[in-house]
Design a protein with these regions (language model features):
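Short hydrophobic/Thr-rich beta-strand motif most characteristic of the beta2 strand and flanking loop
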Residues: 42-50, 57
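Conserved phosphotransfer microenvironments
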Residues: 51, 64-84, 101
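Alpha4 helix (beta4-alpha4-beta5 surface) of REC/receiver domains from two-component response regulators
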Residues: 79, 100-115
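C-terminal output helix
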Residues: 121-130
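The C-terminal output helix
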Residues: 131-146
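Basic, amphipathic alpha-helical hairpins
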Residues: 156-169, 188-192, 209-218, 238, ...
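Basic/polar phosphate-binding segments, predominantly the helix-turn-helix DNA-binding elements
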Residues: 170-202, 223-245
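…primarily DNA-binding HTH/wHTH and HhH modules…
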Residues: 236-265
């Protein structure tokens, strides 16, 4: 899949291409960040929001897809999904849960739920499902080509979802995935049009966004949790990616607005 060179290029002066809107609902920062970053070529994404926030957002601009991660859900899972579907009847929904959530499928009959993925998440299968739904919904879209991840890149994304804050080399990542460093670099670049380091940086910025939105940690603590050296390092990278300082972003994202909060992805 073709990904943007930074997590938020529109904020630094480039023209924004009109894209479909995607909400990634859930409070697992690694999983939601990897999904948001990986699908940004196709969608304007916002990740790491709660079910209650998602319900408020659906009242605003139309949504194309909602991915609901049931881990640490703030509302009853079936209620949340049914409420989201009722407020956005044409929106497609994909659910992520553990084996204990498998029974929820029986309670969602009749809704536009187009996939149930159990943990550990197969990011390759998830991307393939999203790609198929996107192409079926809009065959004439210039961005409607298939998105695909190799098994190698699928394992890399899974590793990033749990180890994004750690410092590791390409060799360490390759050992974890089970391929040579050269193979990993070549295949991941072919699949995503970027290096593993670039993708991990975007994931860290996305995690920082979620922490700034939902936690009251000081900047150095946000930096530590997201994988940056310190608050100064986070500020430099965050401004490069979003055009705003972390403090500005926190104020803006928490400010009450008359309509649903604007998407931040």
């Amino acid at each position: 899949m073709t990904l943007r060179p930074t997590a938020d290029t529109a904020a630094v002066g480039r023209p924004r291409v009109e894209r479909k809107r995607l909400l990634v609902v859930g409070r697992d920062p690694g999983v939601t960040a990897v999904i948001a970053v990986g699908l940004r070529p196709r969608f304007e994404t916002e990740a790491g929001i709660t079910a209650a926030e998602a319900l408020a957002q659906v009242r605003g601009e139309p949504l194309s897809l909602i991915i609901v991660d049931l881990a640490h859900s703030d509302l009853d899972a079936a209620f949340s999904i049914r409420a989201l579907a009722a407020r956005s009847p044409n929106c497609q929904i994909i659910v992520i849960g553990s084996t204990e959530h498998a029974g929820i499928a029986d309670r969602l009959v009749g809704l536009h739920v187009h996939g149930f993925f159990t943990r550990p998440i197969d990011f390759g299968a998830l991307v393939a499902r999203v790609s198929l739904l996107s192409r079926l919904a809009d065959d004439n879209s210039p961005d409607a080509g298939a998105l695909a991840l190799s098994r190698c890149s699928t394992h890399v994304l899974a590793y990033f979802s749990t180890h994004y804050a750690e410092s590791f080399s390409l060799a360490t990542l390759a050992r974890a995935v089970g391929v040579s460093p050269g193979t990993l670099a070549r295949v991941f670049l072919q699949d995503t049009k970027r290096s593993p380091r670039s993708f991990r940086c975007d994931v860290r910025v996305e995690v920082a966004k979620q922490l700034l939105a939902h936690e009251d940690h000081k900047l150095d603590r946000v930096a530590e949790l997201a994988g940056f050296v310190d608050g100064s390092h986070l500020s430099r990278v965050f401004r490069l990616h979003t055009g705003r300082s972390p403090g500005q972003y926190r104020v803006e994202i928490r400010s009450p607005r008359p309509e649903a909060r604007c998407a931040s992805g």
